[in-house]
Amino acid sequence: LIAAGVTVVDLSADFRLKDPPIYEKWYAPPPATDLLAQAAVGLPELTGDELAAAAERRAAGEAGLVGCAGCYPTATSLAAAPAIRAGLVDAAAPVVADAVSGVTGAGKKATERTHYCCANENLEAYGVGTHRHTPEIEQILGLEGRLVFTPHLAPLNRGLLSTVTLPLAPGAAPTTEELVELYRDFYAASPLVSVMDAGVQPRTASVAGTCRAQGGVAVHPAGMIVATGASDHLGQGAAGQGVE
């Protein structure tokens, strides 16, 4: 399709990672190594420059290629990016992300883990230290080798919540109210992202069935920023994001 000049918005993981060795480490040999570098990451709120370049190529009669960000990377990156890009996060310390997703995030194939009698009334971590979305989040946020990511499966049909713990940079001492203002300024031009008031946290029920995302942020007394992001993994983070 690309060779024929067709612009492609890909919802799989084939074009999310730009570095072939990293792709092969976490997945397998890339299906199209030569296309990885030119693919724009499909997360409009955070990768506008890449998407604008793809749009320019398309306007010039060339094919554009977009690799839509995955579900966990979407919620996690939306939650963490404003603080990181503002320089408030220690650039040498690990960042911890714990995320919870509903069972439809695993796809429609029947498995023991997603079978009703196994998933109902059950919460469990999986892919600990090995989940393939780890390098994608690191790439978007510039956290190479510093992300501790642990996904969890919850008995929800739809909805994903990511909690990101970010160590404050030396000398940084924002208040929660200042962070809320920072986040709202950051997403002022992003109508699908809402930032909650100080003391209020995102809820999966508020975004399920939509392409919207909610973010929350607070300062922890231990010198941390705790940022949370909620989305519907079938909307923002999948098909809906492709449309966006």
Where are these regions (language model features)?
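An anion-binding loop in the catalytic cleft
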Residues: 221-224, 228-244
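Loop/helix-junction capping segments adjacent to catalytic residues or to phosphate/diphosphate-binding pockets
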Residues: 73-77, 173, 236-237
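N-terminal Rossmann-like NAD(P) cofactor-binding subdomain of oxidoreductases
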Residues: 1-119, 126, 218-221
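Generic recognition of short, well-ordered alpha-helical segments
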Residues: 21, 78, 178, 240-241
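Short, solvent-exposed amphipathic alpha-helical segments in soluble enzyme
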Residues: 2-4, 82, 182-186, 243-244
